[in-house]
Each structure stands twice: as structure tokens, then as C-alpha cells.
Design a protein with these regions (language model features):
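Formylglycine-dependent sulfatase
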Residues: 1-457, 465, 474-478, 482-495, ...
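A contiguous, mid-protein "functional segment" used to position or interact
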Residues: 484-523
Length: 555
């Protein structure tokens, strides 16, 4: 093996941390992802910086917390001026490429204000979150009475039409729908159809299609590149709609499902924000056993298909000799409740939502000692970008980056983790739950602090906090946020959260070292303060202020 030349950054959408066999799932076997874990390090305590697609991804792509980059929800633009993965890596001689989804919304107003044309190189990169896209496809081509969810063109839809799938929106009508007994479209948006096979050839469904694009790049483009590359291979699945083509649609019946994690005690005097989410349409749907069983079977089938495609990809990397020069990362942007805690989707901070898988394969000989190991250190998604910077031969710019490089953990099994606690944020101001609670947008915010024992959630808007003891209650069933016996614990948690909140990285244009180097330099540029007489300082510091006056304008 050799030092990594390239980086393959694989992100799945809505993949839970515990739905891999290497993470202990008893029925869902993922041998290809397990194989990568056997060659690298599997991190068991990786947390995203927001449990919603857009905000989480913007944190991964900038290496910054949501409060710092500001793109707090899907469709909220990442402001012009935020450095992204591409900005950091390109200046080190590494290209930053994209295949798949980013959920990035360009700051069109900011670009207009600065006179940046969208079709210029810099304008295109600002619009694509700093990546040079090979293919950008965000994978949600939904249409309703008010129009399209995403107004971009879909490369995947173009592919399906070229393959003969006849529809205005083949993404829905074939890849994400089945056929009912009368020959009608059975939409994957309806949970009752999750047991049906999607009406598409398996090889034409989204995950194999994107995998083929990656292999095409590896075969046709990568070998001739003069510069090393980081390619973000970003899959839409196993994100909803919950429907999958044959043979995956009926692989996982109820006997293979993990028991739902929920308890009636969670609904006794519950926190009002928690109630708002359990009582929404998604939470109510996933209380039903038939809904959970149908959706979970399809979800597991989608993950099995993902693993099979990882096998295809890894086999190609190995056969082409590129495996030994490519760092490979597998992770997700958030999880999926799947009925746990009386919830569906993601959004809140229980483990199924905010904790994600993270597997890193580092081909460097320096990582040989950690191959096949498990790391329980608290890490965050924002740690990936500083890791990539170091792999590219640079030093992370810590005035901007708020994560820590994982290379010490990848290359030294005895190193402890970089942090005492992790942080995640959630801005729910755009959701109906904020309206139900009567919360103004500025107050519709949640902050999670999770340390070795406690998970603490602060809610703006005058709400009480939430608190879970992960030692005695690892399933997070008992909220101690209003229990007087835990007042001291809550105070200690607030101290940790405040220690994070008062140190945002907003001074991004000057490094710490530049500030250190400037100490005292103003005196040598003529700013002479704190001096009474000339003999108190070096004569050269007053040289420009001495000599005969050329004119006299006084009396």
C-alpha cells in the first residue's frame, strides 16, 4: 500500500448507523461495507451537525457548524464567501469533483450583488458548493399543485427517457412507483405501496445508475488526470420514497425487522416540542405497525442494494489498482427514526436520527496498526474536511474549520479523541411544528450537546431543556430535563454548551498565526504609544518624526 493519492468520499442519504451487519444488525447482511470496515476504522460515535439533509451536508462541505455557515435548512442558500471543500483542496493541488446529490442552494442574491455570473467558473463553483460536478442530481424530482420541488434538470430522468421509460417524470413513475393489480401507477409516496417492486429494471434504478457513473469516471477520466482528486459520490438512497426494485422488495419481512424502540413513558407528560413532532402526519403514520413494516422492509432492501453496489465499486477499484492509492470514506447525512420514539423521518436528536455510520479506509502504511478496528471516540461530520486537507498535504485552516483531523485516530490506535462533547443544531422554523408551537423563526432552534454520558438539548423560545442519561437509559426513553434531581447535571451541560456557543469561528480571513506574527508590529510602522520621552525606546522608531521643521506656521 501507499500514501493516499485520491479520496473517494461516499455519502448515503438517511442511512442509520445501526443498519449494517458490521454495526450489529442481526438480519441485514452488508458484506461489502463490512469488508471496507475490516480494512479501515469504523467509528461508532459519529454525529452530524444537523439532523436534516441540507444543513448537515453544508456542515460536511464547509467543515463548520450550522451557526457558522448559516445554511440552516433545505433550500437555505450557502452564503457567498463560505469556503467549501473544493476551495480548501484545490489550492493544495487536488480537484474536488461531484457525482450525485448535494442539496446545495446557490446564493443567487449574493452572486448578483457581487456581479458574479452563474456561468463563470467561480459562479458555477459557488452554485455547486465548491465542487466541479461530473453529474449533479439531487434525486427528489417531485411535482405537486404548486409545481416542482426542484427546478433543476434531472440527469437521471434524462437517462431513463433515453432508455425508453415513457413518462413526463420517469423518476417517479418507474424508479419510485410500482404497478397495482389494475395496471395503475402505485406511487412510492404511499406507504401501502412500499411492499411492491418498483416498476424499473434493477440495473436502471438510482443506486446502480450512479455507481456506473463512478466506474465510468474511474475508467475513462481518472487515469489521465494530472492532479489528484477528491470525488464526492453522493447517493440519494435509502432516503424515501420507500420503494425498491425486485429482487430487493421482498427480501426483508417482519421477522427480519429489529424491534421498535419506543415506550409509553415517552408520552407521559412529554416535552411540548417532542409532542409537536410525534403528532405530525409522519409521526402518526409510523405509530402504525403496518406502515412501519412496509416502509422498513423497503428501507432494508434499499440498503442491501447499496451494499451490493459497493461490492461492484470496490471490485473495480481493486482490479484497476486504484484501491491502494485511494482513501475511501462511507458515511450518511443523518439517520431515520423508522417508528422509534413514536417518530418517523429524522429532525430530532435521538440516536437513530443524529448518529451516523462512519467508516474510513486509509491505504497509508501508517494506518496498518488500526486496520479492522473500532473507534469509540466522539467525532463529527465536520472532521472529514480537515482530514482531507491533511491527506492533500496541507495544514487545516483552523480559523475557518471547526472540526479536527481524523488522521491521528486512523494512524495511531492509542490516541484519544479530539473532543469532550459533540454538537448538533436544528432550525425548525420552516416546519408546521413551529406554527403549532407558536414559535417565531428566531426562536425555533434546538441545540444538542452530547458528552460521554449525557445528551442535553436546549430549546430556544422559553421551553425547558431535554436530558437523557445514556449510561442508564441508552435507548433515550426517559426525559430528565424537568426533573429537579438533575438540576446540577443540567447546569453542567449548559456550561459545556455555552463554552461552545461563545467561540464561533467568525474571524475567517486571518489565521491565528498571522495574528501572532502581527503582535507589536504597529510600533515599527510608526504607531508609537505609551512613550513619554525619546530615550525610552529605540531611536530608529522615532527616526521619521525627528529633524528640523521645514516651515513654521505658528506665532
Amino acid at each position: 500500500m501507499a500514501e493516499p493519492k485520491n479520496i473517494l468520499f461516499i455519502m448515503f442519504d438517511q442511512l442509520r448507523f445501526d443498519y449494517l451487519s458490521c454495526a450489529g444488525h442481526p438480519h441485514l447482511h452488508t458484506p461489502h461495507i463490512d469488508w471496507l470496515a475490516s480494512k479501515g476504522v469504523r467509528f461508532t460515535q459519529c454525529y452530524v451537525q444537523s439532523p436534516v439533509c441540507g444543513a448537515s451536508r453544508m456542515s460536511s462541505y464547509t467543515g463548520r457548524y450550522v451557526s457558522s455557515h448559516g445554511a440552516s435548512w433545505n433550500g437555505v442558500p450557502l452564503k457567498v464567501g463560505e469556503w467549501t471543500m473544493g476551495d480548501h483542496l484545490r489550492q493544495l493541488g487536488m480537484d474536488a469533483l461531484l457525482l450525485g446529490k448535494t442539496h446545495m442552494r446557490a446564493d443567487a442574491e449574493g452572486m448578483r450583488r457581487l456581479g458574479l455570473a452563474p456561468d463563470s467558473i467561480i459562479g458555477a463553483r459557488l452554485s455547486e458548493c465548491g465542487f466541479d460536478p461530473i453529474i449533479r442530481d439531487d434525486g427528489l424530482w417531485a411535482f405537486g399543485p404548486d409545481g416542482a420541488y426542484d427546478d433543476q434538470e434531472s440527469p437521471y430522468n434524462a437517462f431513463l427517457r433515453a432508455e425508453g421509460y415513457d413518462a413526463d417524470n420517469p423518476w417517479h413513475d418507474y424508479a419510485n412507483a410500482g404497478i397495482d393489480n389494475e395496471g395503475n401507477i402505485a406511487s412510492g409516496w404511499l406507504y401501502e405501496n412500499a411492499r411492491r417492486p418498483a416498476n424499473i429494471r434493477e440495473e436502471d434504478s438510482e443506486t446502480p445508475w450512479l455507481t456506473r457513473q463512478m466506474i465510468k469516471f474511474l475508467e475513462q477520466d481518472a487515469p489521465g488526470r494530472e492532479r489528484p482528486w477528491m470525488c464526492h459520490l453522493s447517493y440519494i438512497k435509502p432516503h424515501w420514497p420507500y420503494i425498491v426494485p425486485a429482487p430487493y422488495h421482498d427480501m426483508y419481512g417482519p421477522d427480519s425487522h429489529k424491534p421498535v424502540v419506543r415506550d409509553a413513558r415517552e408520552l407521559e407528560n412529554p416535552h411540548p416540542i417532542y409532542v409537536a413532532f410525534t403528532d405530525n402526519a409522519i409521526g402518526q403514520a409510523f405509530r402504525r405497525d403496518d406502515v412501519r413494516e412496509a416502509a422498513l422492509g423497503a428501507y432494508m432492501g434499499l440498503i442491501k442494494q447499496i451494499d451490493d453496489q459497493m461490492g461492484v465499486l470496490f471490485k473495480h477499484l481493486e482490479a484497476s489498482g486504484q484501491l491502494d492509492e485511494t482513501m475511501i470514506v462511507i458515511t450518511s447525512d443523518h439517520g431515520d427514526y423508522m417508528g422509534d420514539h413514536w417518530l418517523g423521518e429524522k429532525d430530532l436528536f435521538h440516536e437513530p436520527s443524529v448518529k451516523v455510520p462512519l467508516i474510513v479506509y486509509d491505504p497509508s502504511p501508517a494506518a496498518d496498526a488500526t486496520r479492522g478496528t473500532v473507534c469509540d471516540a466522539l467525532v463529527e461530520s465536520i472532521d472529514l474536511l480537515p482530514t482531507f486537507v491533511e491527506v492533500a498535504g496541507g495544514m487545516p485552516r483552523m480559523e475557518m474549520l471547526e472540526g479536527y483531523s481524523l488522521l491521528p485516530l486512523l494512524r495511531n490506535a492509542k490516541v484519544t479523541g479530539p473532543r469532550e462533547f459533540t454538537i448538533s443544531e436544528y432550525d425548525y422554523s420552516v416546519t408546521p411544528m413551529a406554527a403549532r408551537l407558536g414559535v417565531a423563526p428566531r426562536d425555533a432552534r434546538l441545540f444538542m450537546m452530547r458528552d460521554a454520558r449525557w445528551k442535553f438539548i436546549h430549546a430556544e423560545g422559553g421551553f425547558a431543556p431535554m436530558l437523557f442519561d445514556l449510561d442508564s437509559d441508552p435507548d433515550e426513553l426517559i426525559d430528565l430535563g424537568r426533573d429537579p434531581a438533575y438540576a446540577a447535571v443540567r447546569d453542567a451541560c449548559y456550561d459545556k454548551l455555552f463554552s461552545w456557543a461563545r467561540r464561533p469561528s467568525q474571524r475567517t480571513t486571518v489565521s491565528d498565526q498571522q495574528l501572532i506574527d502581527r503582535r507589536g508590529k504597529s510600533r515599527r510602522k510608526g504607531i508609537v504609544l505609551g512613550v513619554n520621552t525619546a530615550d525610552e525606546i529605540d531611536a530608529e522608531l522615532l527616526e521619521k518624526y525627528q529633524g528640523k521643521a521645514r516651515q513654521s506656521h505658528g506665532e
